[in-house]
């Protein structure tokens, strides 16, 4: 049998074990970046704020927070089989996501510590937090007789390269959206304790503050590196080998000019906001809908709240944000969810691969069209939008 990323400690206790979730476009990703560019960053523009955030990290407010108590004893056995499967799937995805953050931050802290010690220390503290989160989630999985094989994940996961600019945008949004997701669940369960299916959720209030501090760090880092956020590398990498040439420098300067146009940063802001929002919405209203129902949450209302709040938060650092209040915004996201349901039905139906591909094509085209229309929606200028959220 092929090696699994999930190890069963006692498979008979969980209906002969859980098959690891199949990797899809909606699955958590593992990232790498240009470490040389990161270590050469000049932080002087906003070094004072970064030092203040690093001091917050040093205090490690949640050092003693992630300690399990007696509430965990027997909690797994109280869940019915359907809820158990939904919750284990949530644990697996969340643990993988946290572990992905740990690997990126840890590698950054090691690679840049000589030339950029302040930045390296910040990443080391965030790696500490992400490792703590992943370990706590993995411990909860052990209550169900399972554990993620994190070593296997490290060695066998495909790593996606993102330049520093993209890492800043994507990770900032990931941390901030994580804050709003956790605090929304915590507040809902605080008001509806009967829907709290597992004691893990008692930890979400303090947990989300780690996510918030991480997001604040990337906010400060982007303010310290406005050029790096908008520029591109002078090096070209082909087949693992790096090449430089004087012509690359001229080409780089032209691309640098384009990337420093005000319009460019606005386009990137819209791209990453839409990518994060659409991915979350499609996942939560598609494959995760029943999980939120088990918590007494309506997935659509929950996601719209989280998206609206994250969009407001992003206005503090991005030049523009999405117009989530446009009547068509959520309607088009709902259409993508509908298309994905049809695509899933086709994939699980009888028929050969060729016929299935032709049946899927209209829905793929429709999804592309919906995303394009969403991207082309007139954005909200952050300088006009910000006062309403402060």
Curated annotation (Swiss-Prot):
Enzyme Commission no: 1.14.13.81
GO biological process entries: light-independent chlorophyll biosynthetic process; photosynthesis
Record pathway: Porphyrin-containing compound metabolism; chlorophyll biosynthesis (light-independent)
GO function term, MF aspect, one: magnesium-protoporphyrin IX monomethyl ester (oxidative) cyclase activity
Catalysed reaction, written as an equation: Mg-protoporphyrin IX 13-monomethyl ester + 3 NADPH + 3 O2 + 2 H(+) = 3,8-divinyl protochlorophyllide a + 3 NADP(+) + 5 H2O
Keywords, alphabetical: Chlorophyll biosynthesis, Iron, Metal-binding, NADP, Oxidoreductase, Photosynthesis
SUPFAM superfamilies to which the protein is assigned, alphabetical: Ferritin-like (SSF47240)
This protein's record includes keyword Zinc: no
The protein's required cofactors: Fe cation
InterPro entries: AcsF (IPR008434), Ferritin-like_SF (IPR009078), Rr_diiron-bd_dom (IPR003251)
Family indicated by similarity: Belongs to the AcsF family.
Function: Catalyzes the formation of the isocyclic ring in chlorophyll biosynthesis. Mediates the cyclase reaction, which results in the formation of divinylprotochlorophyllide (Pchlide) characteristic of all chlorophylls from magnesium-protoporphyrin IX 13-monomethyl ester (MgPMME).
Name this polypeptide is given: Magnesium-protoporphyrin IX monomethyl ester [oxidative] cyclase
Organism: Prochlorococcus marinus (strain AS9601)
Lineage: Bacteria, Bacillati, Cyanobacteriota, Cyanophyceae, Synechococcales
